[in-house]
Amino acid sequence: MDISTLANLINAVAVTAGVIFAATQIRDYRRQRKRDSMLSLVRSFQSPTFARGLRRVIELPDNASADQVREILGPEGEDLIVHVTATWETIGVLLFHGELTIDIIDDFFSGPILISWRKLLPYTTDIRQQYQRDTWSEWFQWLAERMMERESTAPAVPAYIAHARGTKSYDRWLHRR
């Protein structure tokens, strides 16, 4: 083997190693971005303002008109609604753009999203009419509809049942630890 062939071989090995390294770095970056998105999601749910707002929303009576919601919650309560719906909006956008998976959202928030939408639909409709903006809470609605579609094909199963000792998912969890 002459020196030129050896140099070409070394060059090919170096380029291949570089491509493999770059692919590994990209994969690791994507995993980190997914983890960061999930942590951000958890943090949004753990803020005192969000928790207070969600509690106020889920305590609303079903089918309450927008005026009833305003009367029950008052101006500060309406501010809390904006905070909760903005969080759902953000999660909807992140899901649509592939930054979060529907599985993660379902694990964290399926119940609160669906209950919030059920409680706030009349209020949202009124706000859209009042401000002539059908885009008000558009991603919240989109997200709630995706969650409803998901539950229409497979009913929600609590984690303590779906991942109980003896299930395949529990066994997978044990092996990942």
Q: What do the predicted segments below correspond to?
A:
Residues M1-A66:
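Membrane-proximal alpha-helical anchors
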Residues D2-T5, L73, G77:
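Juxtamembrane loop-transmembrane helix junctions in multi-pass integral membrane proteins
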Residues D36, H83-A86, I115:
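Generic recognition of short, well-ordered alpha-helical interface segments
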Residues V42, V82-E89, S110, Q141-A144:
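Generic structural concept
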Residues S44, G53, T87-T90, K119:
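Solvent-exposed, amphipathic alpha-helical segments
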Residues A51-G74, Y123-Y131:
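Membrane-interacting alpha-helical segments
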Residues P75-T101:
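Membrane-proximal soluble helical/coiled-coil segments
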Residues V93-R177:
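An amphipathic alpha-helical interaction surface
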